[in-house]
Regions:
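Membrane-interface helix-loop junctions and terminal tails of multi-pass membrane proteins
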Residues: 1-292
């Protein structure tokens, strides 16, 4: 399929792709936290990793042929810095990703509202803006530290200091971008149509392993878009700026980790790859290369 040269179509494709990603991912979290009688966390964090990875794969297939399926401001910044993506288009892509995530949060709130409310009643959440309201808020956005595991009052913040959450987010987002650039590397023989599956596996591994620390945001749009929606439906400061201003960890740190990962990949791998020669070298399709 030919990639459209219309940037408007690319922006709309990013909206759609990010919607698919966040709607499917957050729907699983809603099931895991609020499902099964409101007892919460029925499917576990490994299940969350699997479904978020699956959501990434489907989202890339959904919009990659038009927009390249960045789906993530950290990826867009990385491609602009290291792969020649136009800087003038970065705000449009990031804005589209945030809009898609915001609409997805609205959709999750609509579809799962009854179950979420039942969970809040069972958990004695009187107001979503109260400290314990953060446990239903994590359905929509990432949170440092993970309130479902370490709690939301007392000394839970000292048990998991900010620098650990920030460092974790930088490291895992760097790993994400390193793997993406390797998967879609155009100087290595590669099956372009399998790139979305491979990228989905990367996300599944990172979320499954590191969500216990700070829910493995990896994606500023996936975080800030639903937080804006949360602000509108009563979560107050639990949404923005988050308890102990944790938004800067889950939204801000991936913007450092992504470009850092791109630089690391180029320094250690990309510059050392041989130039493609001969008919046996199969370049990755443009759509897959941009999917990063």
């Amino acid at each position: 399929m030919a990639v459209s040269e219309s940037w408007t179509k690319k922006y709309l494709a990013e909206v759609l792709g990010t919607f698919v990603l966040v709607f499917l991912g957050d729907s699983f979290v809603a099931f895991a936290v609020a499902g099964a009688g409101g007892n919460g966390f029925k499917a576990g964090l490994l299940g969350a990793g699997f479904f978020w990875g699956f959501a990434v794969t489907l989202a890339i297939y959904a919009c990659g042929a038009v927009s390249g399926a960045h789906l993530n401001p950290a990826v867009t910044l990385s491609l602009a810095w290291r792969r020649g993506f136009p800087w003038s288009k970065v705000p449009g892509y990031i804005g589209s990703q945030i809009v898609g995530a915001f609409i997805a949060a609205m959709g999750v709130s609509f579809v799962w509202n009854g179950i979420i409310v039942h969970y809040e009643v069972a958990s004695k959440i009187v107001s979503r803006g109260d400290p314990n309201g953060v446990t239903s808020g994590l359905i929509f956005w990432a949170n440092w530290p993970h309130p479902g595991l370490v709690g939301y009052t007392g000394d839970y913040l000292t048990q998991d200091p900010w620098w650990r959450g920030a460092g974790t987010e930088i490291i895992i987002t760097a790993i994400l971008v390193i793997c993406i650039l390797g998967i879609v590397e155009d100087r290595m023989p590669s099956a372009a149509n399998l790139a979305p599956i491979a990228i989905g596996f990367v996300v599944a591994a990172l979320v499954g392993l590191f969500a216990p620390i700070e829910m493995a945001s990896l994606n500023p749009a996936r975080d800030i878009g639903p937080r804006i929606w949360g602000l509108l439906i009563g979560y107050g400061s639990n949404a923005i700026p988050g308890q102990n201003f944790n938004l800067w960890v889950t939204t801000g740190m991936p913007l450092i980790g992504g470009p850092l990962g791109a630089w690391i990949y180029d320094f250690f791998i990309h510059q050392h790859l041989p130039a493609p020669v001969g008919p046996d070298t199969v370049p990755v399709a443009e759509s897959a290369r941009a999917r990063a």
